[in-house]
A protein has these predicted regions:
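Active-site neighborhood of phospho(di)ester-bond hydrolases with catalytic His/Asp-centered motifs
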Residues: 53, 91-93, 117, 147, ...
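An N-terminally biased module of ancient metal coordination in phosphate/nucleic-acid-related enzymes
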Residues: 1-53, 59, 63-69, 281-282, ...
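Glycine-enriched alpha-helix->loop->beta-strand junction motifs that scaffold or abut catalytic
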Residues: 110-116, 141-145, 174-179, 205-209, ...
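H/E-rich (His + Asp/Glu) clusters that bind or coordinate divalent metals
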Residues: 185-300
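Active-site gating/metal-coordination segments in enzymes
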Residues: 49, 54-161
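Short, flexible/disordered intra-domain loops and linkers
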Residues: 23-27, 59-70, 155-163, 187-194, ...
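Active-site core of metal-dependent hydrolases
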Residues: 118-120, 149-158, 178-188, 208-216
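Distinct, well-ordered alpha-helical segments
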Residues: 99-109, 128-133, 157-173, 189-203, ...
Length: 300
């Protein structure tokens, strides 16, 4: 793990304290304690299982590893944690520019991968490059969905802001990949662009495009919640939490999406995963919103 810059250092500490982790990020037992804490949050929440995400390293278009990024969660570690904890479902991370990308994809499929996660703007992934076509085709053939970060990002370093636009997903969609646009393509800060309108245009064109509601109970991203609810396409939106991003009820109350009584009730829920689910149910998201992901994930 590498955290550079004052903003990321402050934010990482805010998130660590918000989720109740007593150990510093650099402590040798941090990973073990984090997994244990997350498992107990799942067990104590409305949610039965959680999609656990790996995080690949950053590569250039020639497949050379770049000295960029803040942390790396290997696929092997992901599979180990998921084997030991049935509450977790594995979403691997493979940069398609890696020299061994296809081999790693086949290996992860054989190991039971249910989805693949990337942050194109942070991991330098131009999804439109023709040299990645075979990677997308193999994902589509295997039924492995692509959970893709969309919109801005403030918790990890950004290498190319152009890749936060959901329109970069056109090529994987054309090749038949089921794509989940994380965060519903909303903006992450006041000066960031909201791409929700572009997301809806793509949804109208591609029935294999979905979006999730992860991190939408945060101060800025919550601004897209009303658009989601009024989109007329709720059947294409899936529940997500983006844990350990903190969850607050104040902003959705300020936007008129919940009542004062619901805001107070949410404040009594210390479990951030349960609080996030409670707020979405309070806003009117139905039971199917929380189970629809299982229909999209790869069957194993």
């Amino acid at each position: 793990m590498r955290i550079e810059g004052l903003w990321l250092r402050v934010l990482s500490e805010v998130m660590r304290k918000a989720v109740g982790m007593p150990l510093p990020l650099t402590h040798k037992d941090f990973d073990v304690k984090y997994v244990e804490a997350l498992r107990e949050l799942i067990r104590g929440s409305y949610v039965d299982k959680a999609l656990l995400l790996a995080q690949d390293e950053v590569y250039d278009e020639e497949g050379k590893k770049m000295d960029f990024g803040s942390f790396h969660v290997p696929n092997d570690y992901l599979f180990k944690v998921c084997r030991e904890n049935p509450e977790f479902v594995p979403a691997v991370s493979i940069h398609p520019g890696r020299k061994d990308a296809l081999e790693e994809l086949d290996r992860c499929l054989a190991s039971g991968a249910r989805a693949l996660k990337l942050l194109p703007n942070c991991q330098n992934v131009n999804c439109s490059l023709p040299q990645y076509d075979e990677f997308w085709r193999r994902m589509a053939a295997a039924g492995l969905p692509f959970l893709c970060h969309t919109g801005g990002e403030m918790t990890v370093p950004v290498i190319n802001r152009a890749y936060q636009d959901p329109r970069i997903l056109r090529r994987p969609l054309e090749l038949g990949v089921k794509v989940i646009a994380a965060h519903s393509s909303g903006n992450s800060h006041f000066f960031d662009q909201n791409y929700f309108g572009e997301l809806i245009k793509l949804m109208d064109e591609f029935p294999n495009l979905y979006a999730d509601t992860s991190a939408l109970n945060s101060p800025i991203r919550s601004g897209v919640l009303k658009q989601v609810k009024e989109s007329g396409r709720l059947g294409r939106f899936l529940h997500g939490s983006d844990y350990p991003v903190p969850v607050g009820a104040f902003w959705v109350r300020l936007r008129g999406l919940i009542t004062t009584a619901q805001w107070r009730e949410a404040g009594k829920i210390p479990n951030l995963i349960e609080r996030d689910a409670f707020l979405k149910r309070a806003m009117g998201f139905d039971d199917a919103h929380f189970t629809r992901l299982d229909e999209v994930l790869r069957k194993v």
